[in-house]
Amino acid sequence: MDELLEKAKKVREAWDVLRNATTREKNKAIKKIAEKLDERRKEILEANRIDVEKARERGVKESLVDRLALNDKRIDEMIKACETVIGLKDPVGEVIDSWVREDGLRIARVRVPIGPIGIIYESRPNVTVETTILALKSGNTILLRGGSDALNSNKAIVSAIKEALKETEIPESSVEFIENTDRSLVLEMIRLREYLSLVIPRGGYGLISFVRDNATVPVLETGVGNCHIFVDESADLKKAVPVIINAKTQRPGTCNAAEKLLVHEKIAKEFLPVIVEELRKHGVEVRGCEKTREIVPDVVPATEDDWPTEYLDLIIAIKVVKNVDEAIEHIKKYSTGHSESILTENYSNAKKFVSEIDAAAVYVNASTRFTDGGQFGFGAEIGISTQRFHARGPVGLRELTTYKFVVLGNYHVRE
């Protein structure tokens, strides 16, 4: 039996135990995971160092190396995520609503785990921990398929996780990791309907579209982030600058980083030289439309290919627009439905923007970087969904459950 099928069967069998585990048992398992991550910190960081060195040897962009790299702070963040998830309310068993028919039949809608989940992701090893602890807390087993560039890091992390589970009531095989990096396994994995209840791809457009278009297992699509910030004519320009810098430069390789900046034409002459200079101080390559280049001639000319592109790098494209309506139309055309922001002091424009922009998260006077499970108070997230069905935005514990109807009768029969 090959590795994929063997491990898929294991997570399916383990789910029969995990879905009935108590909150105490699940929290104990997550606490043990946090302890093992700390105990085996040196081993994990050494494995990650090897991955990072190999990535740099291959000429991988530094913004993508940043997604791959671990350090003590990021290990601490993983441990903190474990502690946060332990403190979150267990959604399993929650009675969503209930009612009693006239004949006394009692009907309740009760939250239950989805089932074994397959996660296909690329270079971020912290995803291994975040997805695992959320899956366990919500009663779901997990089959992980990480990117080849993070193989050593992921093996070290999963080894620590499985060692932790051995010391708890939760089956060790509740978490399995596919070590074979053959890409053909992705296609096999997303068609394992017999064993997996859901597949979640986390990565770039190519991975997500491949999974969406080829899976027979239901897919929760985590989206590409071509995120925009629109600076309205009424915006406080002094306050706007740090918001834009934060959105673009804090973690440029993440899906909630701003990729496009739209500026109202009435403030363009005043604002563009300031923001371009500040972006460049932070190492950002600035591209711009013709109107932008009339004001700041030395920016790189933006082409049509720029507007739909998620750079995941220190690059931003700027477009001057006539008004909020043109900004909205531009975003409607090029948005991936992830996170969009308006900076404004005009209530009507803010209300219009929020109403007309179709995205998982729409912001008024805030950085797009807040679209994150931890920032939204969900603890760690398993991904950020840009689809409309089942879950949208950061996918936390509740979004990893479904429900069943529990019907209590007194030997009722239907008339």
Swiss-Prot record:
One GO molecular-function entry: glutamate-5-semialdehyde dehydrogenase activity
Catalysed reactions, as listed in the record: L-glutamate 5-semialdehyde + phosphate + NADP(+) = L-glutamyl 5-phosphate + NADPH + H(+)
Entry's EC annotation: 1.2.1.41
Chief location bin: cytoplasm
Domain of life per record: Bacteria
Matching PANTHER family: DELTA-1-PYRROLINE-5-CARBOXYLATE SYNTHASE, GLUTAMATE SEMIALDEHYDE DEHYDROGENASE
Keyword Cytoplasm: yes
Coiled-coil intervals: none
Pathway in which the depicted protein is active: Amino-acid biosynthesis; L-proline biosynthesis; L-glutamate 5-semialdehyde from L-glutamate: step 2/2
GO CC field: cytoplasm
Keyword Transit peptide applies: no
Record key words, sorted: Amino-acid biosynthesis, Cytoplasm, NADP, Oxidoreductase, Proline biosynthesis
UniProt-recorded name of the protein: Gamma-glutamyl phosphate reductase
